Amino acid sequence: MALVTAPTKACVVNPLKMSQPIGGAYAFMGLRGAMPLLHGSQGCTSFGLTLFVRHFKEAIPLQTTAMSEVATVLGGYENLEQAILNISKRAKPKIIGICSTGVTETNGDDVEAYLKLIRSAYPQLTKLPLVYVSTPDFKGAFQDGWEKAVARMVEVLVDRPSANGLRDPSKVNVLPGCHLTPGDLDELRALLEDFGLYPSFLPDLAGSLDGHIPDEFTSTTIGGIDVDEIASMGRAGWTIAIGAQMQRAAEVMQTKTGVPFRVFERLCGLHPNDDFMMFLSEISGRPIPSKYRRQRSQLADAMLDAHFHIGGRKVAIGAEPDLLFDLSGMLHDMGAQVTVAVTTTQSEVIERIRTKEVLIGDLEDLEGFAKEKHCDLLITHSHGRQAAGRLKVPFYRVGFPIFDRLGAGHQVSVGYRGTRNVIFQIANLVIAHRDENDRPTPDRWRTTPGLPQHVGHRRSTGAPERSIA
């Protein structure tokens, strides 16, 4: 069991974590026709918007109530009212997801009461879902905001089943964690459909942030799960929660609708995917398709090939708790040592990470301990690239944001195929780094000062130079 330690510094230097409001807004982006709204100052929203645009390279729907100094003191009712009216009139969304920020949380705005007043004053908003989630950015992290938003969606949007309501055993709810990419969700959807199951993802980022060009412009999200489909999730046969962060949302779903659930804390690795495949075979009543048996064999072969390069490595990882747990488990299976583990917030899984200590800290902590313990592989998001350069170690980018590489939304790490790809990517990074920095080459052989650096035979002194026609 890992020892979890809290930071003792008076401030955060080079932050690792992203804030709760951004995580909450990210969850609402997986709903069709949605408009996430941050109840706070313009700066809060513009900073988050910049991160999303740089990560996905897409147009991102995100609005603000634009709280000023005066509004912050007197209360944000008028700002929230005006923002909702403007959005409903101009963007015509199917749902508005409202996330609080540190400014409005500190002031103590009762947003739930505000929404009741707004609905009573404007009958045209009666049928427009307004979902509010409390996400103060002075505590918690990105994963906490996502977790709260999804649980709140289940509470507000999912209908209770009728007394004689029938369940569809082939219909499955999937509650993915924030550490999964749109590419991961596409992979999971194909996998579930191969078992004859019909999945409903909440949220479904694969439909809205997968990088496709829509037929026509819309200022809201261009895809995702529809509000009507969310309402019918109570008629599913099972709920699959991916990541420990989704335990709460799955419990809310079961309490409200009676749908049983199972949590899969990891889907990157051989044994976690074996368990996942067996579960899908059990609930569908179908054998595991031969294509996945072949993919399993390919993953086993990839692990054999790559363990020469990954096994024994000292790894430093900085990530959200579920992503840290997922990657560290896979690397441990490959024989690597997770020597430094830094995360952003508390979670029940971090105590079970196979390392001596997990620090809730920042990138300065990650770099400092990686240097102290002589780590030779660094894994975190793009803000860790300078640390990797100073440490002169291979750098594998994961999490959010990844803004200095393309295709962040299409990375796949789930399933046999996704795990195989991650293993190859990390092993190739290690090989390339060794070739560039450690392997001797002819231009490094002559390192003694004074020796000629040119290649070729030496002419005798005084001999005339002959030209070659």
From Swiss-Prot:
Extent of Basic and acidic residues compositional bias: 435-446
SUPFAM superfamilies xrefs: Helical backbone' metal receptor
Keyword Metal-binding among UniProt keywords: yes
Annotated GO biological process: nitrogen fixation; protein-containing complex assembly
Region (Disordered): 435-469
Family matches, as Gene3D superfamilies: 6.10.250.1090, Nitrogenase molybdenum iron protein domain
Gene name as annotated: nifN
Record organism: Bradyrhizobium diazoefficiens (strain JCM 10833 / BCRC 13528 / IAM 13628 / NBRC 14792 / USDA 110)
Family membership noted in the UniProt record: Belongs to the NifD/NifK/NifE/NifN family.
PANTHER family, per database record: LIGHT-INDEPENDENT PROTOCHLOROPHYLLIDE REDUCTASE SUBUNIT B
Protein name: Nitrogenase iron-molybdenum cofactor biosynthesis protein NifN
Function as written in the Swiss-Prot or TrEMBL entry: This protein may play a role in the biosynthesis of the prosthetic group of nitrogenase (FeMo cofactor).
GO MF assignments: metal ion binding; nitrogenase activity
Pfam families, A to Z: Oxidored_nitro
Pathway(s) served: Cofactor biosynthesis; Fe-Mo cofactor biosynthesis
Record key words, sorted: Metal-binding, Nitrogen fixation
Lineage, top ranks: Bacteria, Pseudomonadati, Pseudomonadota, Alphaproteobacteria, Hyphomicrobiales
Highest taxon, organism lineage: Bacteria
Residues bound to [7Fe-Mo-9S-C-homocitryl] cluster: 44
